[in-house]
Amino acid sequence: MSGTSYIIRRMTYDDIPQVAQIDKEAFPGEWVFRSQAAYKQDLDNPSIRYVVAYREQDARESGRQATPRPRWFKRLFSYERRLNTREYVVGFSGFWMMVGEAHIIAIGVREGYRQLGIGERLLIATIDLAQTLRANVVTLEVRASNMIAQELYKKYGFQVTGRRLKYYSSDGEDAIIMSTDSIASLVFQASFRQLKADHAQRHREIIGLVG
């Protein structure tokens, strides 16, 4: 995937088909609860936020240059239809806000793009957005068997706070409940800044949240 960069941005309506496809692939058995219609409803809900990571080929790979647009244009038309066919969504994350808590709905990455730091960057973007919305803590559920994800969450300050028995309808697996301490605390913010800097140093091809 040489010559390729990945950019994190807010999800738009035009991303829904690709995100639903990733959801189905990443969460078989659960994806029916987040259909394309459900994503449309989520994007209409002011308490829910989604971001996506998309793959962008450079001019050498694509053979053409993207038309540059001034910053004011991008702000004004932040939900414009994205006609740039080079934007191939490779991952997404979403959360909902409720009384000072940002609860992560899902973080999913296409099979061919895992272990590239994209999922971690989506988690970073999620925490960034939660801080912007003045959340106090971030929470989530994760499969009891998904140790890789649990280790990533622990790296970012999540701790095990409980267990939901037979939470996943597809196979009856338990869910581990994880939560951060206050993301507004100086201790968390210092650690988070360092983790973000380390990730940016290792993965220069992944550009943080824009727009």
Tell me the role of every PLM-derived stretch.
Residues T139-E141, K154, Q159-I176, Q189, ...:
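Conserved catalytic-core motifs of GNAT/GCN5-like acyltransferases
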Residues L116, L133-N136:
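Short coil/turn segments at alpha/beta junctions that flank glycine-rich nucleotide-binding fingerprints
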Residues Q41-L43, W96, S145, Y167-D171:
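A short beta-turn/loop motif at secondary-structure boundaries
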